[in-house]
Amino acid sequence: MGTLLALVVGAALVSSAWGGCVEVDSETEAVYGMTFKILCISCKRRSETTAETFTEWTFRQKGTEEFVKILRYENEVLQLEEDERFEGRVVWNGSRGTKDLQDLSIFITNVTYNHSGDYECHVYRLLFFENYEHNTSVVKKIHIEVVDKANRDMASIVSEIMMYVLIVVLTIWLVAEMVYCYKKIAAATEAAAQENASEYLAITSESKENCTGVQVAE
């Protein structure tokens, strides 16, 4: 049990140490008329490296062939292209207050069927090193389908089941630990009581012998 606890704690520490930036895939099913978040996360390989980043998003509507630019975000300024499909519907939801963008996500409000298609999140990053600078670029591709109502995918169902299984396992483990500790404390208490009783009997016996010796001497 102690080994299991050590493994759990160790995993938590590792997770927290690497938890500064985690690349997560976006959801791909948007509900008509609702607000939908398209995730785009691009982590630096070395967090201590200074960098400046900007992004451009492009979109290819379902049934068409060409990608068109819908926005650019640079120096904390969101520049939207003139496009009726996205007019008044795009909201920046990525990193703020920094030029070193790692979360480049957006919201699309009041989703319509015209928003079904392929999105590309282009990430352009300039890395500053001691003696030189280095440009990198990454493209995150996301395919979005717009549906009438939300459908739970298999991944979310499995995740929920695993969560409940984990809760049950941890509860059983906690109860077992409590029972184990209780038995250990009870055994230690009983041993201490027996030891005290033995000492008391030994002292009583010795006192009687001393008293008998005194009487004989008299």
UniProtKB/Swiss-Prot annotation:
Keywords of the record: Cell membrane, Cell projection, Disulfide bond, Glycoprotein, Immunoglobulin domain, Ion transport, Membrane, Signal, Sodium, Sodium transport, Transmembrane, Transmembrane helix, Transport
GO-annotated biological processes: positive regulation of voltage-gated sodium channel activity; sodium ion transport
Signal peptide feature range: 1-18
Record topology, Cytoplasmic segments: 180-218
GO molecular function terms attached to this record: sodium channel regulator activity
Membrane topology according to the record: Single-pass type I membrane protein
Family affiliation: Belongs to the sodium channel auxiliary subunit SCN1B (TC 8.A.17) family.
The protein's name: Sodium channel regulatory subunit beta-1
UniProt source species: Canis lupus familiaris (Dog)
